[in-house]
From Swiss-Prot:
Keywords: Activator, DNA-binding, Nucleus, Transcription, Transcription regulation. Residues 104-114, 122-138, 181-198, 207-221, 232-253 have a biased composition (Polar residues). The gene is MSN1. PANTHER family: PROTEIN MSN1 (PTHR37784:SF8). Residues 162-180, 222-231 have a biased composition (Low complexity). This is Protein MSN1. Pfam families: GCR1_C (PF12550). One of its GO terms (cellular component) is cytoplasm.
Length: 382
């Protein structure tokens, strides 16, 4: 019995040892798996963070690219609109020029006398005028045929009537030939032609002749009295038009001009175009010079305030001009602030001039460029 109990106790001890070893092995494996799981989770977290950074950077780049493309498309659309406006303005100018030239070269513009205000004017071409001159000749031909038939029939009275009709048709054709000359005599330049008094195409597009319905203007002026007596129809130039042509010939090329086009309601302004770059005062010596440049203009140029009102930013597209404008804008704004607060112009200029002094005893001043920085503007003018 004692031996059996001893054997049973030893077996229990062995089983407990085996269970303990298995439990320890399982705990070790569980801890190992837990460590592997934590390592994998940490690694996944790192990968997720990297992916988030990459996705955010890509999204930012996509947003920047989208903004750039939208800006580029807007600029292209605006440029296309500007080009279309310029093209339409050019077409309007060409059409207005052709209309004014057709009115200028109208044969009725070289005839004497005035027509009624409500009377329509003839703007037909040369072939139609030739048809009109040839029409009385056709009537004369018909009258000759009737005359031949009347002679065959022996009707003397109808013969006299047909002869009267023939004479009247010939007189009408001669009058038409005198009033409406041929193409060669009508459009050839006379000997007293003066090229300085003929306005150019640009002048007719900008200032087309007024259609007053009764008084037409000629293009040529006779300088010889005998020739003027022989061709009185060529002296239909009004004194206002002559003075305008001579003044346009004497004036130089304008700096600032307006593009105009003609519509059904009259001549309208298209837009104002700046034809030369703006020149700032180089190294101004006082604040008053800078202010006068902004408000009054110098060297025959308009004021910068007027340039901004007319052209916005179109007049300072040059980088150098835009940079100088941005620097001096600080000084103009300071003066305007002082004026808005009720200070006089002389007082504001005196404050700015006093702030330029480096040494009051030697009267040494900083340049105007130093004063164009916002940090150097006095506090009372900020």
């Amino acid at each position: 019995m004692a031996s059996n109990q001893h054997i049973g106790a030893s077996n229990l001890n062995e089983n407990e040892a085996i269970l303990t070893n298995r439990v320890a092995e399982l705990e070790r494996r569980m801890s190992m798996f837990e460590g592997i799981f934590h390592a994998l989770s940490n690694r996944l977290d790192l990968h997720f963070k990297k992916y988030d950074v990459v996705v955010n950077s890509q999204q930012q780049q996509i947003n920047e690219l989208t903004a750039f493309l939208s800006t580029l498309l807007n600029d292209q659309q605006r440029h296309a609109e500007i080009l279309s406006e310029k093209l339409s303005g050019t077409l309007h100018g060409v059409s207005a020029t052709s209309i004014s030239l057709s009115q200028t070269l109208d044969p009725q513009g070289f005839t004497d006398g005035t027509t009624a205000p409500g009377a329509p004017r003839n703007y037909t071409s040369v072939p139609m005028n030739n048809d009109q001159t040839a029409h009385p000749q056709n009537e004369g031909a018909v009258s000759n045929e009737t005359l031949f038939e009347d002679i065959l029939n022996g009707n003397s009275q109808e013969n006299d009537k047909s002869q009267q009709q023939t004479n009247s048709s010939n007189s009408i054709s001669q009058e038409n030939n005198s009033t409406n000359p041929s193409v060669d005599t009508r459009f050839n330049k006379p000997q007293n032609y003066n090229s300085n008094l003929v306005p150019s195409l640009e002048e007719y597009s900008a200032n087309p002749p007024n259609n007053d319905g009764g008084q037409s203007q000629g293009l040529y002026i006779s300088s010889n009295s005998s020739q003027s007596r022989q061709s009185p129809n060529l002296q239909k130039v009004s004194p206002n038009h002559e003075n305008a042509v001579e003044s346009n010939a004497q004036e130089s090329v304008p700096t600032f001009e307006e593009e105009q086009y003609e519509t059904k309601t009259g001549l309208k302004r298209k837009r104002i175009v700046c034809t030369r770059p703006f020149e700032f005062i180089k190294s101004p010596h006082s604040v008053m010079e800078v202010w006068k440049e902004y408000t009054e203009g110098v060297n025959g140029q308009p004021s910068i305030r007027k340039m901004e009102a007319l052209y916005q930013t179109a007049w300072r597209r040059d980088p150098a001009v835009n940079k100088r404008y941005s620097r001096r804008k600080v000084l103009w704004k300071a003066i305007q602030t002082g004026l808005n607060r009720g200070y006089s112009l002389n007082y504001v200029v005196e404050i700015l001039e006093n702030s330029r002094y480096v040494n009051d005893k030697q009267k040494v001043k900083q340049p105007i460029g130093w004063l164009c920085h916002s940090s150097h503007i006095p506090e009372t003018l900020k």
